[in-house]
Regions:
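Canonical positions in the second alpha-helix
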Residues: 10-11, 43-44, 77-78, 111-112
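Structural marker of alpha-solenoid helical repeat scaffolds
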Residues: 47, 64, 81-82, 98, ...
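Short coil turns that delineate tetratricopeptide repeat
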Residues: 15-16, 49, 83, 117
Length: 147
């Protein structure tokens, strides 16, 4: 099987002024090299603070480690830079669910669905989340959601 890492690493070193770190970090993440991916993203996000993809990949590094607050912060930063990214809002919804905040998770899924209205998967997830939040509200666990 062809290994992409050497080619990506070479390109990354050859063009240090380009934000190629996110692509290389994503590759490392897929290959299980979590700490290398995280270090690369942290450095890259510092060098390229207006590159949203770097923050989205960094959030995945944190999610893998169940570092939910750090993942939320990285996603928030990425979404401030790219506010029309439905995948970012979908992932932020997942992070909020993991943090136990169903209401904010629902708001993020609603935003993702508004940005990608043709996604059947998002529509299904949104309906499931809405049902879960309503059930929690009936038990007094969260603030009710207005319909």
């Amino acid at each position: 099987m062809f290994e992409r890492a050497p080619k990506l690493e070479k390109t990354f070193r050859r063009y240090p002024q380009a934000p190629l770190f996110a692509r290389l970090a994503d590759h490392y993440l897929r290959k299980g090299r979590l700490m290398r991916a995280q270090a690369l993203c942290e450095e890259g996000c510092e060098r390229f603070p207006s590159y949203p993809t770097g923050f989205f990949v960094l959030s995945r590094c944190y999610e893998r480690q169940r570092m939910w607050e750090e993942a939320r912060t990285a996603l928030d930063h990425g979404l401030r830079l790219d506010p029309d990214n439905p995948a970012g809002y979908r992932r932020l919804a997942h992070v909020y669910r993991e943090m136990g905040n169903e209401t904010l998770a629902l708001k993020c899924l609603e935003r993702a669905a508004a940005l990608d209205p043709l996604s059947e998967t998002l529509g299904f997830e949104l309906e499931q989340m809405l049902t879960a939040v309503r059930n929690c509200a009936r038990r007094g666990a969260v603030t009710p959601v207005a319909e």
